[in-house]
């Protein structure tokens, strides 16, 4: 699974790795460092696999480029995931094709409500307009990709999350949701590294110092290869 987190550096007035960016926790712009993480879960274990520091202004790669690089490295190291889990930020067509076509892996991801799907050949509609009942799993054609299964989660406030998978055998709604719920383990991981490593409390301003102090703490978690 992959997701990014913001290392809050709001009290560091100058930091070469930090920039103003939106924080979901703060519900606004915060000065921070964007860290993109990839994890492997095995039962109740949460195992870090890889990470990247994303710097929008000076990075020659997007977060999606980093995501693909980490996937390729995981593939080269012998990982065989049951599912690759990610949110809508990482569910671009290029990413889905890399996972499903090149690596022959299955994915479960969020889709934004405006992603185009088709029930009838040649007719595309936003997934938000799809006739999709609660707890229904439906087979549709995702534009520029191919057949997928989709379902939706409706929370207590009525907000809707759309999920998609290329595993056309995942027809039972409860199984679909149960597999995707593993993605929340990356949120546990992000909270854990912030609380236990002090990674947000390093106020070095130079990128070279940050890389030398903060991320060896992170990489000290000893990224494994699968057994």
Language model feature labels by segment:
Residues 9-14, 44-227:
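Single, function-defining residue in the core of a domain
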């Amino acid at each position: 699974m992959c997701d990014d987190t913001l290392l809050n550096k709001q009290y560091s007035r100058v930091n070469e790795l930090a920039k103003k960016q939106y924080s979901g926790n703060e519900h606004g712009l915060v000065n921070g460092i964007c860290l993109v993480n990839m994890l492997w879960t095995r039962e109740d274990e949460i195992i870090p696999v890889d990470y990247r520091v994303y710097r929008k202004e000076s990075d020659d790669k997007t977060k999606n480029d980093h995501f693909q690089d980490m996937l390729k490295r995981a593939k080269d190291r012998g990982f065989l995931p049951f599912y690759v889990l990610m949110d809508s930020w990482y569910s671009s067509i290029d990413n889905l094709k890399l996972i499903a076509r090149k690596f022959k892996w299955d994915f479960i991801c969020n889709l934004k409500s405006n992603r185009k799907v088709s029930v009838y050949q040649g007719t595309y509609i936003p997934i938000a307009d799809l006739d999709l009942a609660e707890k229904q799993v439906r087979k549709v054609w995702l534009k520029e990709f191919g057949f997928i299964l989709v379902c939706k989660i409706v929370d207590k406030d009525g907000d809707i999350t759309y999920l998609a998978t290329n595993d056309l055998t995942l027809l039972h709604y409860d199984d679909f949701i149960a597999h995707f719920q593993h993605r929340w383990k990356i949120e546990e991981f992000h909270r854990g590294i912030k609380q236990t490593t002090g990674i947000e409390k390093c106020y070095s301003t130079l990128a070279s110092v940050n890389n030398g102090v903060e991320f060896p703490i992170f990489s000290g978690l000893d990224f494994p290869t699968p057994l």
